[in-house]
Amino acid sequence: SAMGQRTGCPLKESNMVSRYKKEFLELERIGVGEFGSVYKCIKRLDGCVYAIKRSKRPLAGSSDEQLALREVYAHAVLGHHPHVVRYYSAWAEDDHMIIQNEHCNGGSLQDALLENAKRGQYFLEAELKEILLQVSMGLKYIHNSGLVHLDIKPSNIFICHKLAVEGHAGQEESDSEDEFSSGVMYKIGDLGHVTSITNPQVEEGDRRFLANEVLQEQYCHLPKADIFALSLTIALAAGAGPLPHNGAMWHHIRKGNVPSIPQKLPDGFLELLKLMIHPDPVERPSATALTKHPVLRPSLEKTVQLQKQLNVEKCKTAMLESLMKDQPLSAKLPESETSSKQNSKRLVGGKNCRSFSFTLGY
């Protein structure tokens, strides 16, 4: 009976008409993987374009089903963030599982790298920093939600080009997506390997991007495995050759050596990429640290300095004011000096005010 079929599987749809065919118009296949295929579709109801992932339905109750459901559960936990591919819906029909996600009009970073390779090009410094910064923002959000991605690589980073046509209509509502002057947004997708930081069920991602400690089944610093994979992703975007799956070169990289990059990048930037693949995960910067890193956000560094200076000045002023409240300066000075405005002014001006010292916790 139809009822009998539905038990024990959270993904069963009982009605026989395909929801996929009914609700979506398939335009083209845009991706294919071991799981199945991704199609660019228009939803008939709203006229919007979506990326629809159709995969062979795993056996109910199998470990494959758990894996297939990870992505759905992860999206449910995560909610919406500008640097994570947005999730809309998931369901199952006949022998397929279907996930409806945001469509990124620029394809994946992997697509862009293949295109670059054909033309003998690669991403340059400014773009590389932009990718690193934006993906770090997505990772910061994922990690702060208590999750890790565990499959960061070019084919799981998606590119959205802001269309110029969007013009003036939506200019008032400036959200975090407008920070990026380049008009390109990079987003993390494919959450099929996502797991919890505190209670991880690790399904290893791509060997080429895998940190050694994860291979050794040491899971105490899992977010740093995402950082490791992100560094190698940036190296590839910078023009590095294909990464090894194993062997001597694989181990050479795990000792903290960035794959050779065919363009001149600033030392500070290369040092950062090197730090991100440090053999000791504790030494690698967190995603939060990357989002504030002076190499990626030089203007932020200036702002922080000015903020500190301002705080110091505020502190001095406050202390001077409280001192003057407690003991009026006039009480401390001989008559002749109080009458001389110049001196009291100099005392308050703080230039040669040596009457107290204080330290600030920076």
Predicted regions and their residues:
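Activation segment signature within eukaryotic-like protein kinase domains
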Residues: 131-132
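Conserved short submotifs of the Hanks-type protein kinase catalytic core
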Residues: 95-108
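Conserved N-lobe beta3->alphaC-helix segment of eukaryotic protein kinase catalytic domains
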Residues: 55-79
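Glycine-rich ATP phosphate-binding loop
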Residues: 37-58
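Terminal C-lobe "cap" of eukaryotic-type protein kinase domains
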Residues: 279-283, 289-304
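Catalytic-loop of the protein kinase fold
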Residues: 143-160, 166-176
